Amino acid sequence: MILSFYQMVKGDVSFRLPQGMFSPEQISLMKQAKCIILPPICRSVHYWFCKKFAPVFPCMDTRFHFPGKVGHIFLFELAGIPYPPTKVYHGLEEFKKRQAEGEKLFEYPFVVKWSKGGGGVFVHLVKNEKELFYILEQFRGYEKKGPSFIIQPYIEHDHCDLRVVVIGNRFLTYWRCQQTPGEFRSNVSRGAKIFYNLNPKLEQKAISLTKKLCQKTGINLAAMDIMFSKDKKPFFLEINYGFGVHGLGGFQRYKEILNEEVKTWINSVLKNNDKKSVI
């Protein structure tokens, strides 16, 4: 029996994911389930609870073990995935302490990113010390939600980044190119345009690195943002577990691909279970 809490994927039995605790009926069904499907953005307690009963799609282990942009940096390092030189700070007081001890920053301009937030929110290009301290003071109001932030050098590139979307065993790519004067972020929500097949060689390089990351982590539903420097070196920027679907052909196309890949994943799980039962 396949149990789904994700409206986009129909199971043998389907529910909306509850806000609080699962009902006795739902828990009883979990105990019978061969597989459980969850929405890609859910609470950690729901995810870990479901995993106690059956294999879960999507795999969100890394999302909860390595949260936010800070967590992504640690994950990239462990997996041997290239990323920009990065300084990690766990709050403004730590930043001030390390500066007082003589730690040097990158040369201006550099990029400051609060660990949380998506769509380019809380990502700033800093051109001088005055701008830096103005931005850090803005972060102060968000410290209760998580104080960590990172600083990375600004890498010269062609104002485009590549998004590699992982859906099960499928790896789909598209470029986001920023053509708005004065805007350095390549988010579609900030005016970037979507293009396809701009550089197949770089796209294949990015897919190979993404496959390596997925093999090491189990990630099977996420979008990777990757930048290429002027000399074509790849740098992974972040992992998006919730992502827009416009570049994939829209909602309906995404739903079709998702259901195809979930079906493949379920068949793989059931096949492995059959092998174990024979052994």
Predicted regions, residues:
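Short glycine-enriched loops at secondary-structure junctions
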Residues: 39-43, 62-63, 177-180, 227-231
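Protein kinase-like catalytic core scaffold
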Residues: 110, 150, 172-173, 222, ...
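C-terminal active-site "lid" helix and adjoining low-complexity regulatory extension at the edge
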Residues: 228-279
